[in-house]
């Protein structure tokens, strides 16, 4: 059995909000498996469901660019927020987003492509900027959405300058209707996505393994109630529907009008747009998503510096 360390207990406690002893018990019961420990706590009603476990800590900017029927989004990381406020860095992220659009969001093609207005590749330009600014930085990821007939809308949350911020969203809408009205609807949906962080556009696109894991947790949790199997089955199905309402875009309550789901809001907008509308998909990048920043002991650093 894996050794249960204090840092493991601390990480689980920070992720779930459960008590220290409960976290230790969960890790002991699951042989130190962090994901299984989260599920164990949930079956005991000691932790809330988490769409994504893990701490988020990275600096830099999300860059978004859209030209009507296509849009690209990139994440460029830096070591400090100070650099993210640097105009040179901001221009670089904007340029890289534009370059990403030209290669349809393909990451490998992006870093190898020619940096706008330069003979260098994007990767070489970033490397040069590391020397100029004096801080490590990197292009972390890129994506693109396009539609054949319709609109791609963009939204940036916590925007520092146009097209750059901490959260970026692109959403693609297929429709032969009024493009101006379609873009406005798309922007509202993009704002909704920034706020709610859905996992999929429609439930058929959900990761089956994730749904199965959720179902297993709900079954185990329901069995703790001691109720008959037929009642448990109904309880689980009801909670799975609730799960979809929380994480599937079209099933979510629309933040702009919570009385409607996003799907109903899109359907209602068709009359104004003048044609049927299909939500093709979306991309949502949050700065530092899934990155754990190395923690430093400031007191130890000062002591080490004092010792020379």
From Swiss-Prot:
Localisation per UniProt entry: Cytoplasm
Family classification: Belongs to the EF-Ts family.
Entry superkingdom: Bacteria
InterPro entries: EF-Ts_dimer_sf, Transl_elong_EFTs/EF1B, Transl_elong_EFTs/EF1B_dimer, Transl_elong_Ts_CS, UBA-like_sf
Keyword GTP-binding (UniProt): no
Main location: cytoplasm
Example GO molecular function: translation elongation factor activity
Its job: Associates with the EF-Tu.GDP complex and induces the exchange of GDP to GTP. It remains bound to the aminoacyl-tRNA.EF-Tu.GTP complex up to the GTP hydrolysis stage on the ribosome.
Keywords: Cytoplasm, Elongation factor, Protein biosynthesis
CC annotations in GO: cytoplasm
UniProt name for this protein: Elongation factor Ts
Pfam families tied to this protein: EF_TS
Region (Involved in Mg(2+) ion dislocation from EF-Tu): 80-83
